[in-house]
């Protein structure tokens, strides 16, 4: 979490960089509420996504990017709550203009469930120590 603290104070942050896992859970809860609010607004306007909304309105709805530096730390402190928020966001947030960048050193199912992993369209892995970790990251198995 120290890596992201260097970004503290840049002008486009919606909130300060959060380094406490408990506070991160409450912020993720706010992001879920924001996503639901955006869905209600887009439904009222009759559009399917943020791009459609922004084409119809002078006051554009901004995109939100949520960056989670170490998912396993969050899962240790507030596992089920974090899992529920991330799962909901990974399934529905893109249309509302909310995107998640999530990092972890351990891509195992106790950190990132199969449902969450299936809803992230892109994965990047720099280096793994053993081959089975490649399968966990890329979510495929050789039979």
Model-predicted segments: where are they?
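P-loop NTPase switch/communication element
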Residues: 1-20, 27-29, 115
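P-loop NTPase motor-domain active sites and their immediate coupling elements
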Residues: 26-143
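Residues in soluble alpha-helical coiled-coils and helical-bundle/repeat scaffolds
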Residues: 15-22, 76-80
């Amino acid at each position: 979490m120290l890596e992201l603290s260097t970004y503290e104070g840049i002008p486009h942050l919606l909130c300060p960089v959060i380094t406490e896992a408990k506070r991160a859970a409450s912020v993720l809860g706010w992001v879920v509420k924001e996503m639901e609010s955006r869905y209600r607004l887009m439904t009222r306007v009759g559009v399917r996504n943020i791009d459609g909304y922004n084409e119809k309105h002078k006051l554009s709805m901004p995109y939100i990017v949520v960056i989670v530096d170490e998912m396993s730390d969050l899962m240790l402190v507030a596992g089920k709550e974090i899992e529920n928020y991330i799962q909901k966001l990974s399934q529905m947030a893109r249309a509302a203009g909310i995107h998640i960048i999530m990092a972890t050193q351990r891509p195992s199912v106790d950190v990132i469930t199969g449902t969450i992993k299936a809803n992230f369209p892109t994965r990047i892995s720099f280096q793994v120590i053993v081959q089975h970790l490649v399968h966990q990251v890329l979510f495929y198995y050789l039979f």
